Amino acid sequence: MLKFQTVRGGLRLLGVRRSSTAPVASPNVRRLEYKPIKKVMVANRGEIAIRVFRACTELGIRTVAVYSEQDTGQMHRQKADEAYLIGRGLAPVQAYLHIPDIIKVAKENGVDAVHPGYGFLSERADFAQACQDAGVRFIGPSPEVVRKMGDKVEARAIAIAAGVPVVPGTNSPINSLHEAHEFSNTYGFPIIFKAAYGGGGRGMRVVHSYEELEENYTRAYSEALAAFGNGALFVEKFIEKPRHIEVQILGDQYGNILHLYERDCSIQRRHQKVVEIAPATHLDPQLRSRLTSDSVKLAKQVGYENAGTVEFLVDKHGKHYFIEVNSRLQVEHTVTEEITDVDLVHAQIHVSEGRSLPDLGLRQENIRINGCAIQCRVTTEDPARSFQPDTGRIEVFRSGEGMGIRLDNASAFQGAVISPHYDSLLVKVIAHGKDHPTAATKMSRALAEFRVRGVKTNIPFLQNVLNNQQFLAGIVDTQFIDENPELFQLRPAQNRAQKLLHYLGHVMVNGPTTPIPVKVSPSPVDPIVPVVPIGPPPAGFRDILLREGPEGFARAVRNHQGLLLMDTTFRDAHQSLLATRVRTHDLKKIAPYVAHNFNNLFSIENWGGATFDVAMRFLYECPWRRLQELRELIPNIPFQMLLRGANAVGYTNYPDNVVFKFCEVAKENGMDVFRIFDSLNYLPNMLLGMEAAGSAGGVVEAAISYTGDVADPSRTKYSLEYYMGLAEELVRAGTHILCIKDMAGLLKPAACTMLVSSLRDRFPDLPLHIHTHDTSGSGVAAMLACAQAGADVVDVAVDSMSGMTSQPSMGALVACTKGTPLDTEVPLERVFDYSEYWEGARGLYAAFDCTATMKSGNSDVYENEIPGGQYTNLHFQAHSMGLGSKFKEVKKAYVEANQMLGDLIKVTPSSKIVGDLAQFMVQNGLSRAEAEAQAEELSFPRSVVEFLQGYIGIPHGGFPEPFRSKVLKDLPRIEGRPGASLPPLNLKELEKDLIDRHGEEVTPEDVLSAAMYPDVFAQFKDFTATFGPLDSLNTRLFLQGPKIAEEFEVELERGKTLHIKALAVSDLNRAGQRQVFFELNGQLRSILVKDTQAMKEMHFHPKALKDVKGQIGAPMPGKVIDVKVAAGAKVVKGQPLCVLSAMKMETVVTSPMEGTIRKVHVTKDMTLEGDDLILEIE
């Protein structure tokens, strides 16, 4: 008996009680014996197999699965009551096409009926016949109908006989390329090749010209042969921009045929459906009537039974053309089920048992459209790379569910392996709503809930489709995707949690990602962050700057009573003591406290210099992001950066437009004071930097680099007159503030008094700023002398980050001036709390701390004049190479090298040049005299040669002769400012290159980072693409990773906190990987990490290097089915090189350039991973 329920104005079939009573048939139709089905085998895999199993279970029918050797881990074999292996030793697809094995399983296991699903053998008449011959029912049309409908040429003839309009095309499969030529001569282009024995987009190619004909014919034939076992093709006229409408039909064995209305499958890519809609929106009722009546008429013409689909193209004039009949269940049958409340699989089974449609309560007048349904096929394809299939292991799978959402899936679960052997479909998501916009909203919400990690998916693309106004309006055709390129403006998933786990796992397996100079673990104690009051910080000098501009700011500084301080803790202090390794994570922690308690600072030095490239190179963080985040936390204190004149923040010369743009963007991101210097005090370089900073609206602070001793009358090269003359030039050029940059700490109190008082007398209204290092130990005394001589600002570092090669102690300066006219008005007790935090933070960076090898400063700096940061580096390098006892020789060589080069101003990059020459002399056992005597024969460091060529400017007093001429010989020399001859850099072109290289949104900041440090930036972007931003990790985890069983929290952003526990690390597998297990927010996660040390001993196929022109990599994982070139062959751009097959789709890899094949790294039948090197072109 039947049970029905009234649903939204229609009747819903709830179920059929299985009995032995005969079905009701028309009086004029022969009554058939009712034969209940007790066991069904699905000759298919994946989600369609599971869909049928579920229907069978609901009907009390036992289920049988078949699976290939490659599918042993797939879910469909677990969802059945029984599962059997087929196609042993066969290729993955061939296993499911092997009829003898399938029939054997059916007969040996008492199977009553076989459901073919879709694809594979579902439209093979010989399979339907084989089932019938074996006494097993085929759940589908009769073999004869399958044959007729599967042969698209015969189906076309039947349609014509039935009076159904068809597209002009061949009457039978073509046997040669010549026939395709003849057809195109008759009907013109475009034309389309179609597989004669299957669908789903396989073996389908559109051709627009004679030039494309041969290649597309070959590819279509090959795809059809691979997918359906028969490469036969037919060709027809291609209807441009049609709607693709298909009508669901259902017939029984008594001649009853009905339709279940239509579906719009117009949203396609390469003739494969991506999104399906039921019913078709804005479809004229008369056209709907013609489509459905023609479908029923065609089905009756051929005596159709069971479920099927009649497909049509509808042109822009509303004229419809028959395409084909799919004599099987369609992938998109789900949307019809949702809007009609008819379970099509139930109906298929009941019809195969001998029931009639009226038995099932299915009459045309009872079929009503209820609402709208949309199906999205979520696939493991990368839309950003032309939908290339992705393979790999699903690390995370979380689906979107809720009211109005149906999911049909198979092996979509954490740990599932997506292979290249089969279709890329992961899950079908079906949304049902009262109308099209409602269904689209539900679908969009569901897709937004999905989390799939480990493989790429097309979800971002689907979300763009769902948000497209044309789609929401329901106006779509088969060119929808091609005509809406904005659909490919994909917003990349953040994937922050999984990327963090990948990073932590990588560190646990391979050790720190940043080089660790000393094997010392970070302190286990977190630094104590002092309490910060609630509310905005008090006003500071930045408020004056924003209100009155650079000139007003300079006046306020000059008119201020008392000594002003610049805090270098955020930059130069950790550059000098901790190898510039302090992370933004630790700077941000203390930043609010500084804003609230040190608002009367002149500025905070927190950017520029070495921090820029070290941030990317070793800390894997964006220096611009550091600036932005600190600006948000410290809105009231001016920020100051170190700008290397025409070198900006790099070590070489850049085109002028790069320097100007850099300053402009730095100002936009929150930089205030630009302290501009040149390593040689070369005025043209400094003037360029000043002009760039000034035009950006920044405070221009020209810095004169100090060396020598103005108080020593025997030191005549860098005399008081030299500095005063340089100051005159800089003031004339419009500097707002004048700075003396004493990078080696050479200013003695007497020299301070002489130099500063002279500058104050000469420039009474100009703010004076003094920067020094405390290597000699006299820094506090020197800064007090400067203040007493008229300096407005001196540099200090908080106590626990001061001294040695860093700046003088903040607390000492504050205490020494307290109660005097120079009182800094900085609360001393606040300095204590600030220092306590940095004492704890410094412990986190123990592996980089200079005190690992250097226990104190040294007054010999007055002799060797080594800058603070470089003194630390040279000291460490000597000890790390076992030359600690020879550091004295290094310092002596530094002095000699300096004199050989003409007694230079020594600050980056000139200090590095002197250091390189010194180390060269020590390593080669050369004295100054020997080096000078052998200058013509020796191969000096590149930095030395380029300096002598004039690459960084002209030193005071000129180049040393004859040493320069001996070294350079015939090498070219640069006259004047080095950057003046450089052509402007095309920043727009660079931006385009970066987008092509990294495949994501590129900011103006990224462009400038790449302009300054192209290689470092590229490595940084590649690193973060794999591991994501790491600023949320604490420094201990960043450097050494977690210990097993360690639990910790990571705050991604306000209100989003991850709870993580490290569980275990597995043994090495055959691929050179270790599996690392975590618990994330209570759920088990695991990732595979390559063991870099172990992989050095294993052989793997080489990868194509993206930055090496001519290295062609596999665009996707797959199998090589054809190699079209050999070594030595000449190729042109666009020429096919090889053909890959993956997920039953073929991809032709073409040459991106003209050249000669240097080497081919693949052979036919080789299986490749993504980016595996295919060949090299030169």
Swiss-Prot record:
Gene Ontology biological process terms, A to Z: gluconeogenesis; lipid metabolic process; NADH metabolic process; NADP metabolic process; negative regulation of gene expression; oxaloacetate metabolic process; positive regulation by host of viral process; positive regulation of phospholipid biosynthetic process
CDD domains linked: biotinyl_domain, DRE_TIM_PC_TC_5S
The protein's Enzyme Commission number: 6.4.1.1
UniProt keyword annotations, A-Z: Acetylation, ATP-binding, Biotin, Gluconeogenesis, Ligase, Lipid biosynthesis, Lipid metabolism, Manganese, Metal-binding, Mitochondrion, Multifunctional enzyme, Nucleotide-binding, Phosphoprotein, Pyruvate, Transit peptide
Domain Pyruvate carboxyltransferase: 563-832
Binding annotation for substrate: 571-575, 644, 908
Molecular functions (GO terms): ATP binding; biotin binding; identical protein binding; metal ion binding; pyruvate carboxylase activity
Binding site for Mn(2+): 572, 741, 771, 773
Location of the Biotin carboxylation domain: 36-486
Sequence positions that bind ATP: 152, 236, 271
GO cellular component, one term: mitochondrion
Cofactor(s) demanded: biotin; Mn(2+)
Known pathway: Carbohydrate biosynthesis; gluconeogenesis
Transit peptide: 1-20
Modified residues (N6-biotinyllysine): 1144
Places the protein is found: Mitochondrion matrix
Post-translational note: Acetylation of Lys-748 might play a role in catalytic activity regulation.
Enzyme's top EC category: ligase
In-chain residues carrying the UniProt-annotated modification N6-carboxylysine: 741
Catalytic reactions of this protein: hydrogencarbonate + pyruvate + ATP = oxaloacetate + ADP + phosphate + H(+)
Protein name from the UniProt record: Pyruvate carboxylase, mitochondrial
Lineage, broadest ranks: Eukaryota, Metazoa, Chordata, Craniata, Vertebrata
Gene: Pc
